[in-house]
Amino acid sequence: MTILYAVIACGLLSVLYAIWATRSVLASDQGNARMQEISAAIREGAQAYLARQYTTIALVGVVVLLLAWWLLSITAAIGFLIGAVLSGAAGFIGMHVSVRANVRTAQAASNSLAAGLDIAFKSGAITGMLVAGLALLGVSIYYLILTGPMGLQPNDRIVIDSLVALGFGASLISIFARLGGGIFTKGADVGGDLVGKVEAGIPEDDPRNPATIADNVGDNVGDCAGMAADLFETYAVTVVATMVLGAIFFGGTAVLGAAMLYPLAICGACILTSIVGTFFVKLGANGSIMGALYKGLIVTGLLSIVGLAVATSVCFGWGEIGTVAGMVITGKNLFICGLIGLAVTGLIVVITEYYTGTNKRPVNSIAQASVTGHGTNVIQGLAVSLESTALPAIVIVGGIISTYQLAGLYGTAIAVTTMLGLAGMIVALDAFGPVTDNAGGIAEMAGLPKEVRHSTDALDAVGNTTKAVTKGYAIGSAGLGALVLFAAYSNDLKFFAANGDKYPYFQGMGEISFDLSNPYVVAGLIFGGLIPYLFGGIAMTAVGRAAGAIVEEVRKQFREDPGIMAGTSKPNYARAVDLLTKAAIREMIIPSLLPVLAPLVVYFGVLLISGSKASAFAALGASLLGVIVNGLFVAISMTSGGGAWDNAKKSFEDGFTDKDGVKHLKGSEAHKASVTGDTVGDPYKDTAGPAVNPAIKITNIVALLLLAVLAHG
């Protein structure tokens, strides 16, 4: 219990850090009256959208809560509620700060680049520490209540089902927040760009564009609240799945409690290292913003090695722990698995930055292709998006095989848990992005001097890269996390099948095989494989419809009031925000339910056709693998490709020199071609790609809960 109390203390410290950082950010100067007016409009729009989104989610959540109570138990229903409320709170509070930090960053940037970086990063760190702290507190305190006052054994089915339900609560919030926020932000961005930049020829963030405020609102609801919910879910479900595997593999042994506490201890230690790492983010003498951010990330990673060693030593020691599936597990090997998790994180960050960073080969190749036209830009962008999947996949494969050889599936789970231990710092890097983007918009709309805009542009360019890098991390950890969930599903299934006397539904079922000679397994793989593509297609269509509505709205305002373009009258910003809010909420419902219902359709569909429970469970398991494999490639391809398109466009804003030495500036034909590519890449990287993440995990969580419901019944 001492370890558990220490873990809870780490979670509380994370929340205290967020409170301190919030006070520090809000105490900063808000700039002049015009800047505050623009910031207030962004803030009101973001809060109005989020309030409506959470109201919609709450209606769905109440139904799921009652179903969890009826089909499982009151403890499962409470677990679901904890996961949903804390996930929503992390995103809402983080966004509450980011929509106030934007104007303060713009004002600080007018003093110095270092001051602007300090406020923007501190604002991002608030969201990051809330995600890690609240997720850890939710799981650890609920586990403490279940195994303490309620007197349940750590591997009791009630404990396991309640923790899985907590993960499902986080998942439900995540998929709605990711998809709804993505539709809103890219509907505004694409629609505003098509009319503003392409038709009217006005720059980005020009106050004459009626979609400008909606675009800035979208940055917050998509990249701040959406990413927070996504990584909260990955964090929570991975820790829960690792605890479930610990309960299955070490049940009935002396190390059962330690095996379930170990992932919590790792996350607690990594929260401390992330907090320390934030204090190292300072602009150096060379003025490199990315260098300052990486300094904090590297310090966090190095200190996490020490934290991992302490967690291993306290929970297990370094010697033999036990034998799982004929494999001897040692504390030393688990520590090495954790190191591999940290290495995978570092490699994915480096690879994603290579594919999306300015002045790197992939981005330069898209910029060069823009010189010959719109079509060649799109072709090269698609080529980069496909190519960008190879290296991350090889790294993930290496991580899976090496950790499995060292400590079996539990070792793989520990590697993923260690990856997610860094979530506090990684989310801080991501939430830094929308703050700097908004700061640039405020500087432009408020007519601040060019020097200020130069500073905010430098921060925004780095913010674009950090957003892409964190998406790569989120996808890699989601794919590996889903693999851990699949391991929990297959081992849970074995457990129920072997204990048919206790669980009558599974009686006489025998061993379930995922053999590819079984046609139901192949059918399950194909069905699972189609889900990420169908889901991505629906998401892209939704953005297209939302963008179309914004195009019509902006054209209408320009047509009805010529004074807008002349600068003598103001556009109606609120009308565009309201239109997008309604569109995003309407469009997110059906695709969000797709990954929730898919596992149920597979299981009951195959059961109805074959009449065999074993075949139905095999098909369901295969469909989970299909979702994981295809989802991983679809998500990496979309996010890296979209990020590369975006930064290729940014290359022209500073002036791009092609292979013949000709310089192409903003407004040139090559720049216009790059805007077309960015328009395609925007929903790729900010809507469909990131939303595939929670879709991968939620299918696996639903499958785990289905087993629990059938066993309970």
Swiss-Prot record:
Mg(2+) 2 binds at N216, D219, D437. It catalyses: diphosphate + H2O + H(+)(in) = 2 phosphate + 2 H(+)(out). Its EC number is 7.1.3.1. Proton pump that utilizes the energy of pyrophosphate hydrolysis as the driving force for proton movement across the membrane. Generates a proton motive force. The record marks K467 as: Determinant of potassium independence. Keywords: Calcium, Cell inner membrane, Cell membrane, Hydrogen ion transport, Ion transport, Magnesium, Membrane, Metal-binding, Translocase, Transmembrane, Transmembrane helix, Transport. Ca(2+) binds at D646, D678, D682. The keyword Transport applies. It is an enzyme of class 7 (translocase). GO terms for cellular component: plasma membrane. This is K(+)-insensitive pyrophosphate-energized proton pump. The record marks R178, D223, D230, D686, K697 as: Important for ion transport. It holds the Pfam family H_PPase. It comes from Mesorhizobium japonicum (strain LMG 29417 / CECT 9101 / MAFF 303099). Its main location: membrane. Signal peptide: none annotated. Its cofactor is Mg(2+). Belongs to the H(+)-translocating pyrophosphatase (TC 3.A.10) family. K(+)-insensitive subfamily. Mg(2+) 1 binds at D189, D193. It is found in: Cell inner membrane. Substrate binds at K186, K685.
